[in-house]
């Protein structure tokens, strides 16, 4: 089946409504929305700007807000005014990686059912890149990048979009609960476990 090269008005409206439902934000710019789905391979063959800059922006927005949300959840000021982390740095890193990785982002795109709307060049179409995990993850990042630019970098919009699209609060709670439940307490690690649970 040959892919369409451009969205029609009905496609744009459908995607806007779906993205609003999943992120809490309605993208105003139809051009930016189309660009989020336009791969470089198409732009080389035809015309227009690709989604690469939106992908880059979305990657940075995701990274920042996921770290912020984990930090808000797992860190606090102590009596001395120091920032006290309830988790170690290596756990923080692995937690962030578990929450945001290519497989997770691709699975969200699959759940949304929108990879078929990617606008690709002939070589990408032939190789069915729209089915590749990395390409789907890039699409997710592009959508977040469009939300950032379209909202004029509104921090409330961005945090809400990241929380909602990743189901971050529920997933974070589940991961932390499962990790703490799987810890075994013995003489060697009892103090560490108690500190982390405090």
Predicted features and spans:
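Double-stranded RNA-binding/processing signature
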Residues: 1-198
């Amino acid at each position: 089946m040959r892919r369409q090269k451009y969205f029609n008005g009905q496609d744009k409206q459908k995607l806007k409504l779906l993205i609003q439902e999943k992120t809490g934000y309605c993208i105003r710019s139809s051009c930016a929305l189309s660009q989020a789905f336009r791969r470089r391979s198409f732009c080389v063959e035809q015309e227009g700007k690709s989604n690469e800059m939106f992908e880059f922006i979305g990657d940075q927005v995701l990274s920042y807000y996921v770290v912020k949300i984990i930090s808000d959840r797992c860190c606090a000021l102590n009596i001395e005014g120091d920032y006290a982390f309830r988790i170690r740095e290596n756990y923080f890193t692995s937690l962030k990686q578990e929450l945001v990785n290519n497989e997770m982002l691709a699975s969200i795109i699959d759940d949304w059912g929108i990879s078929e709307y990617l606008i690709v060049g002939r070589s990408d179409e032939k190789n069915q890149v729209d089915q590749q995990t990395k390409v789907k993850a890039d699409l997710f990042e592009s959508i977040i990048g469009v939300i950032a630019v379209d909202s004029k970098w509104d921090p409330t919009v961005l945090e809400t979009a990241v929380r909602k699209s990743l189901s971050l609060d529920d997933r974070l709670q589940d991961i932390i609960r499962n990790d703490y439940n799987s810890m075994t307490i013995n003489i060697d690690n009892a103090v560490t476990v108690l500190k982390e649970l405090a």
